[in-house]
Amino acid sequence: MKYIAKKCGVRFQPPAMILIYENEAEGKSRQRIMPVRNFSKFSDCTRAAEQLKNNPRHKSYLEQVSLKQLEKLFVFLRGSLQGQSLAETMEQIQRETTIDPEEDLNKLDDKELAKRKSIMDELFEKNQKRKDDPSFVYDVEVEFPQDEQLQSCSWDTASVDEF
């Protein structure tokens, strides 16, 4: 049987993931409540999302729901268990999923660095122009304005004297 996922959400009390789906054979919309057991404010959201998605009981229903979306819903659930408001949890997710250009990536631990790199890879893939894109241009020439004065740096002039 084929199920088409329409909406996916989270219920905080008692903790559960809720999926609104359409049964392809009947064409009826239905709601599936998947209880979340053994999840605390210290739980790993990635692991919990993988376990729910790979659970044989829910697997066929969650085929069209991305792992990232389930992870995000588990982060909301964990934030609720930690006593955070929805706004605080959304702000935390926003901080974790965006890259600050001024952030020093050398100071991050391996796990955080891997997370930042995966975010950068996703952004690159999303923004990358491919040959089959309608707005793709093979040889782009860009002219830079020559009116502005070139700024020199102190180390530029120092290195010229050494040679």
UniProtKB/Swiss-Prot annotation:
The keyword Cytoplasm applies. GO terms for biological process: cilium assembly; microtubule anchoring at centrosome; vesicle targeting, trans-Golgi to periciliary membrane compartment. GO terms for cellular component: centriole; centrosome; ciliary basal body; cilium; cytoplasm; spindle pole. It comes from the Eukaryota. It is found in: Cytoplasm, Cytoskeleton, Microtubule organizing center, Centrosome, Centriole; Cytoplasm, Cytoskeleton, Spindle pole; Cytoplasm, Cytoskeleton, Cilium basal body. It holds the Pfam family CEP19. Coiled coil: none annotated. Keywords: Cell projection, Cilium, Cilium biogenesis/degradation, Cytoplasm, Cytoskeleton. The keyword Cytoplasm applies. Signal peptide: none annotated. Interacts with CEP43; this interaction is required for its localization to the mother centriole. Interacts (via residues 121-150) with RABL2B. Interacts (via C-terminus) with CEP350; this interaction is required for its localization to the mother centriole. Belongs to the CEP19 family. This is Centrosomal protein of 19 kDa. It comes from Rattus norvegicus. The gene is Cep19.
